[in-house]
Every structure is written in C-alpha cells, then in structure tokens.
Amino acid sequence: MARRNYKVLYVSGEVSPFVRVSSLADFMASFPQALEEEGFEARIMMPKYGIINDRKFRLHDVLRLSDIEVPLKEKTEMLHVKVTALPSSKIQTYFLYNEKHFKRSGLFSDLQLGGDHKGSAEKLIFFSVGVMETLVRLGWQPDIIHCNDWHAGLVPLLARTRYAKHDFFKKVKIVQSVHNVYRQGVFQPKMFQKHLDPEVFDGLEREGDDINLLATGIKYADLVTTTSPSYAKQIASDPESSFGMDKALKACKDRFHGILNGMDTRQWNPSSDKLIKKRYSAAQPELKLEDKKVLLEEVGLPFSEETPVVGVITTFDDVQGMGLLKESLSKLLELDLQLIVSGSGNKEFEQELRDLVEEHPEKLAVNTDFTDAFYHQMIAGLDMLIMPSRIESCGMKQMFAMNYGTVPIAYAGGGIVETIEEVSGDKGTGFVFTDYTAEALTAKLGEALSMFDDKERWAELMREGMERDFSWSASAEQYAELYREILG
C-alpha cells in the first residue's frame, strides 16, 4: 500500500527571505522543503508585516481568502490573505494581513524585547486565531500544525480548547519547536484576558503574574523539538541555560527531542549563489578572494590579501554575545586583522561600535542594515566568523560559513560541538573555546590567525569545511519518523 502524503502547516513569525531576524528564518526557508522530499505536503503561514515588499516577493491576493472573520472575545475583525511560493520551491506561503495590526508594524515584541507590548499582544492574538480561521476557509486540512518559537505558542492552546471540537481540527497533531529558549513571549495578561474567551485565557501558562507563550505551546503540543541533541539536554537540565524553561521541558521529557539543524544547500552554495560577486567551490577556494575584495569595498575597508578579515553576525544582546564582544573588542583591534560587525539591537552598543570605527577606520566596519544579499556576501567574503553567543541552540551561521570556506570560531555551547570539529593536527573545521571569557576568545582567535599565515594549511582547513555534509537529509528523516509516530 502506498504511504499517505500527510499535510503539515508551518506557523512562524519569520521566514527568509521575506523577513529575517534570527536563524529561525533560515530554518523556515529550508526545513519545509526537506520534509516535502520525505513525502509530506507542506504549507506555511506567517504575518504580513508592513516591512515585507509585496512586489519584490510577488505576493498576490487570493479572492476566496479575503474578508475572513477573526472572532475575538468582544469583537470580530477582518483578515485578508496574500500568497506566494517559497523561493526555489512550490511551497505555498500565506501572509495574514490586517491594516490595523500590520500596516506600519515590524515583528512581534514582548516584555523581554521592549517596544509595543500592548500592540504586539493584540496582533499576536489576531494572527493566531487568524491561522485557524484561514485553514477553515482554505479547506486545506493539516494532519500536523508545526509551531515555531513563542510567536506561534498560542496556536497549540487554541487547537486544544476553542477549536478542539471543530470537525476540521479534531484529529490534528501539534508540534512545538524551540529555536531560541531565551525568547519566550512574556506578556502582561490584560490584552489576553480582553481578547480571549475564558477557556483559552485560563489555559495560558504563567510566569509569575505574566503570560508565557513558549511554555504554553510546549504544554499543549504532542511533540516538542529543538535544534540539536546537545541543546536539548542542556536546556532540559539547566535552569540558567533554559532561562527557567527547564521545568516545562522536564514535564514533557517523553515527547521532547533534539534534532540537529540542517541547511539549504541549494540556497547556500558558493558555486551557484547568485547573491555573491564571485562563485567558487572547494576545488577552487582561491576564487573566494574576489568576494573578500567586494565585501571590504562595500563596508569601506581597504583590501590586503595578507590581512585576515574576521566577522561577527549577531543580535546585540547579552545572550547572543554582546557582553563578550564588548570585553574583547579592544584586544581584537590590537591584532593584525580587519573586523566587520553586523547586527542590530542595543542602540547604545551600536553607538559604541560607531565611535570605535572613528578611531579605527581601516580596521573596523559596522553594518546594521542586514539584507539577504549582504548576508551572503559577508559569509562569502570573510576569512573567519566569530560566534560569540553564550548559548547557541544550534544556529546555522557556522554551517553557512564552513560551506563557503569561512572558518568559524565559536563558544562550545549547544549545537556548536555537533557541527564544528575542533582543529587538531591536520583535521578539523574550526576553532572552539570552552571558557566564556574575552581571554579565551582572543587566544583561540590567535590560534586561527597563526594558521592563516600558513597558506597551504589554511586552504586545507577551508576545503575540510566546504566538503562536510550539512544538508537536511539525515535530520529530515528523523523528523519524518517522529511525525509518523504521533500520527499513529
């Protein structure tokens, strides 16, 4: 008997290339495609933020998905849906839109992130109920709804309360993925109480007096996953690493799995990448030099073949390594290198970096306008990539880097140890430091700089990383097996 093609809806607050803030967007750009290759039919739903360019991404209206009613506790609002295909695939991606909630807005924010908590709570509730109502109008009945991070944490609760008896959702299974345990979707309860019926509101998980959406998603999911086996063990056992989520994860230990992230080797392939200046491969890594020139020109730094270009791509907050970067900068700028820092977040730190650029105009550059094209060119043009995160769930930047012959230097947390092989003798793909200090980072970078001077050995190191298999193949098989398990 032929195996049935199950249907999976992926719900996410970000999907590359439409909008990108974290590695979740990269996951969403590639993982659904990998599961389609395992025999599942995938579709995606996300908010239509005002910052998304309709023309650039060829979004179009769907007549039968206009004027969808979204019933909230005290009122009904209207939802409109636009659609396009995920690039390089046929996967339908639905963008849920309401002028009041999304016309001028950026991404969701919560108490941890600052910003408009009230507005974010309202639009998140609207989006979550909208997902359920859009599915009914669409008539596409998923076997699984796969929710990603806290942005989608309300959907599992809705499926198990308000929509539990709806014929359309009676048999649906829920997966909740934890990509970033630090971001948990913490809100004051006022707006949730205002817009949600009591049976839904009473089911929300609490953190003190506040609502915790990630914990809510975890509680009501049939399957909970995260981005690597090491990270799963770490956050299920260590309150500090999990930011208090360890209790929720221990409570679901029999349905909690860590599966290593993969990457889209079609979108991220230096031999065919249309977003970089010069394409190259493991057979001709020296061609990468042209991308280094272009990158330096783009950020306004002078080019020297002998000077290594080191980069940092991160969010400017303490978990993603802002503190370590601050402590290390003066030491890094004393070394024989050029440094490019790309990221956004803490405005004070951004200004500190710009002040340092004034002092070191030929050694330091800062980029806060992070486009998809710049991301690819930076990964291609760097010699080394520093990953300063204290807790790295798995991340994909190190995989992208190695695939492009850019050598990673990272702290040994989470999935890093499963993706970077520490350089030892003539083996290895990168450099890993085990003490989370500026001294340890600088020392490990020093090792990398010494090896960079040995051109033959450095070329071998580049090739070693470029020849590793970081595709989704093995991990997609594991996910497919778990999907089929919960479906019975």
Swiss-Prot record:
Pathway: Glycan biosynthesis; glycogen biosynthesis. Its EC number is 2.4.1.21. The keyword DNA damage does not apply. Gene3D superfamilies: Glycogen Phosphorylase B (3.40.50.2000). CDD domains: GT5_Glycogen_synthase_DULL1-like. It is an enzyme of class 2 (transferase). One of its GO terms (molecular function) is alpha-1,4-glucan glucosyltransferase (UDP-glucose donor) activity. InterPro entries: Glyco_trans_1 (IPR001296), GS/SS (IPR011835), Starch_synth_cat_dom (IPR013534). ADP-alpha-D-glucose binds at R20. Keywords: Glycogen biosynthesis, Glycosyltransferase, Transferase. It comes from the Bacteria. Signal peptide: none annotated. SUPFAM superfamilies: UDP-Glycosyltransferase/glycogen phosphorylase. Coiled coil: none annotated. The keyword Transferase applies. One of its GO terms (biological process) is glycogen biosynthetic process. It catalyses: [(1->4)-alpha-D-glucosyl](n) + ADP-alpha-D-glucose = [(1->4)-alpha-D-glucosyl](n+1) + ADP + H(+). HAMAP family: Glycogen_synth (MF_00484). Synthesizes alpha-1,4-glucan chains using ADP-glucose. Belongs to the glycosyltransferase 1 family. Bacterial/plant glycogen synthase subfamily. This is Glycogen synthase. It comes from Chlorobaculum parvum (strain DSM 263 / NCIMB 8327). The lineage of its organism: Bacteria, Pseudomonadati, Chlorobiota, Chlorobiia, Chlorobiales.
